[in-house]
Regions:
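S-adenosyl-L-methionine
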Residues: 1
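Conserved Class I SAM-dependent methyltransferase catalytic core
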Residues: 4-83, 246
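Conserved beta-strand segments of the P-loop GTPase G domain that flank and frequently precede/overlap
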Residues: 35-36, 234-236
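Flexible loop/turn segments at secondary-structure boundaries
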Residues: 41-42, 210-212, 324
């Protein structure tokens, strides 16, 4: 059975999404088209085995305001793209914005890119990410040891948890952000128990997928405190100062905007952090004009100066509404 048109709703899973458009390409006669959140046209979605598909994406229309297409809030906007049966090394991009015409632009030709590069439809952010990619990535920090990966810090068995503390037991936070709810486990029964003696920043794996790094969903744990369940460790430090600075950084508006442009699969992936600059957390980082020492003796570093961002770029990032249609 063959159809002239197929209307589908691809699942929000990166691998299944690729399967969906790959099969559509095979079955289409001349072309296929898609309306998806802009981040689904991200090159990080495509592996070296599926990158060839991008050569068939020839035209892209980017709607900065999602309300131009759907009555929803999507932080990275919406794209309509056309996939033909003829491959090419370039694609054409057009920008639409009903609320602010200065963000509209006519057809511009761009190279398709290489595996691992970032496909970005928002031209205002292109220059910013050209600067960010020159800095160490938080993703590489997460991958430096396997204990930073999701589900790798689970205890062997939840049945080993108990409410009364023994001689060599370790307290376990039942919630990554609620250290008042504590159970105990013998140190020998834990995975990566050596990192129990670090100051840690943790987050729920599900909240990582939704880019929801809020006060409630990110935990700052002390030495000697572990955690279990669907949690991931985003940092482990020798000092509480480094932990606190990392904790504040991951909850910042800047981090929420940068990570919202990346796709996370159904299992927490470090790719979510690939565009996020890794910083020296001996210092606290702010969008400020100069480095300064506050009344508590904390050194505040200028994030925008370190990254080489202009005042206009800083203002643009600060004004971006995370999760709203004016993005």
């Amino acid at each position: 059975m063959k159809f002239d048109y197929v209307i589908g709703n691809p699942p929000y899973n990166a691998n299944m999404y690729i399967d969906f458009i790959q099969m559509a390409y095979y079955h289409s006669k001349k072309a296929s088209s898609y309306i998806v959140p802009a981040k689904w046209l991200n090159l990080t979605t495509f592996s070296d085995k599926t990158w060839w598909l991008l050569k068939y994406i020839r035209k892209v229309v980017y709607y900065r305001n999602t309300i131009d297409v759907f009555n929803i809030g999507e932080p990275d906007g919406i794209v309509y793209y056309l996939m033909t049966k003829e491959a090419g090394d370039t694609y054409e991009l057009k920008g639409k914005d009903s609320l602010d015409k200065k963000y509209e632009f006519d057809w511009v030709t761009y190279p398709t890119g290489k595996v691992g590069e970032f496909w970005l439809c928002n031209n205002r952010l292109r220059g910013i990410f050209e600067k960010l990619k020159n800095f160490p990535s938080y993703k590489d920090y997460l991958l430096s040891d396997n204990h930073f990966l999701a589900r790798d810090y689970y205890v062997n068995n939840q049945n080993l948890l108990h409410t009364n503390r023994g001689t060599d037991d370790v307290p376990i936070a039942v919630s990554v952000a609620n250290t008042d709810n504590i159970k105990y486990i013998a140190r020998k029964d834990m995975y990566h128990y050596d990192y129990i003696d670090k100051y840690k920043v943790t987050s729920s794996a599900m909240e990582i997928l939704t880019h929801n790094f809020s006060d409630f969903n990110v935990g700052a744990l002390d030495k000697g405190v572990g955690f279990y369940g669907s949690a991931s460790m985003l940092g482990a430090f020798d000092s509480a100062i480094e932990r606190d600075n990392c904790y504040d950084y991951l909850r910042s508006h800047f981090v929420q905007i940068i990570t919202s442009l990346c796709i996370a699969s159904s299992v927490m992936t470090a790719d979510l952090f690939r565009l996020l600059p890794m910083l020296d957390f001996r210092y606290h980082w702010d969008f400020c004009s100069d480095d300064y020492l506050d009344d508590k003796g904390v050194t505040h570093k200028s994030l925008n100066r370190y990254l080489g961002l202009t005042n206009e770029e800083v203002t643009y990032i600060q004004n971006l509404g995370y999760g709203c249609s004016r993005y």
